[in-house]
Amino acid sequence: MAKKLLLYPAIDLERYSQILDLDVDLNIINADSLEEAQFHITDARGFYGKITPELLTLAEQLTWVQSPTASLEHYVFDQLIDHPCTLTNMKGLFYDVIADHVMCYVLMFARRMHLYMRSQFESKWSPIGGENARSSFTVGPGAVTGMDQAHMHIADCTMGVVGCGSIGSEICNRASHFGMKVIAVDPDVSAEPCGVSELRGTNELPWLLAESDFVVIAAPHTPETEGLFDDAMIAQIKPGGYLINIGRGVIVKLAALSAALERGHLSGAALDVFETEPLPSEHPLWEREDVILTPHVAACSVRVPERHLDTLLENIRRFASDEPLLNVTNKARWY
């Protein structure tokens, strides 16, 4: 008898038809209602969608659950962690897209674009460092002006990446191609990402913070990373450094970040994710010239949806053929 794969909530007919076109020996159920899902989960071997404690309790033969998301902090629950089924996620979809977003932040800070855009909106010609600091032929070769000093040379900078999954690894790669020195920390130090000059364990995070001009958080939301960047941790960032978070909003305490910016410990911050989303309009970060805020769009690209579908189709094919699945997670660690 063919293994049963339950899809719930039901996916749209166009994507469902592509699953049916896989030519695999599976009984695929696209459940339109909770009642239908409850009926079919009892003997389903595979599941795609949003599993709940109620559905999991009814499952008697379940061996595989495919999350529709890469992040798992809102997906896993105690019963699922304890269940013997394999949980796979959708990691690996956004690596280049988010890395580009990070490098955009870095370039904006280094070339002061975040400030020049404000000047443009006000129709102001305001070179940072002052117009009177502009180089002229009366100044001899080798003289560094205030205008020069006000703009960063990226190849002289160090980027520290916190978390070297698919996204963090590609950030390291992109940064190295800009000539930056790249260091990183990750729980797994067995494989050094391309472009990284030194990879250490997460216990060496203070070392990374002290050495980096740009600290990039590319870590997932886990019990260990929640609230990790508090007052004490942010205080360990190199004075004048920049903090970039494209990982998860709950990793950075915004009150602590705001305080560090206010006292001048950090030169700036760029955030795509926040403790509360949307970020309230009255939050003080909106008004800061040294902050770049984007509304959780770092992963947006026309390529991501097709990769999402391709990953699902490939895992369904592997499930039907009893082959090793892609993106097997550690349920207890949420990634």
Where are these regions (language model features)?
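Rossmann-like dinucleotide-binding domain for NAD(H)/NADP(H)
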Residues: 240, 246-335
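Oxidoreductase and adenylate-handling cofactor-binding alpha/beta cores
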Residues: 99-118, 176-180, 310-318, 323
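Rossmann-like adenosine-cofactor binding region
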Residues: 187-284
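N-terminal Rossmann-fold NAD(P) dinucleotide-binding loop
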Residues: 168-169
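Phosphate-binding beta-alpha-beta segment of Rossmann-like dinucleotide-binding domains, i.e.
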Residues: 85, 91-158
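Glycine-rich Rossmann-fold phosphate-binding loop(s) that bind the pyrophosphate
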Residues: 164-165
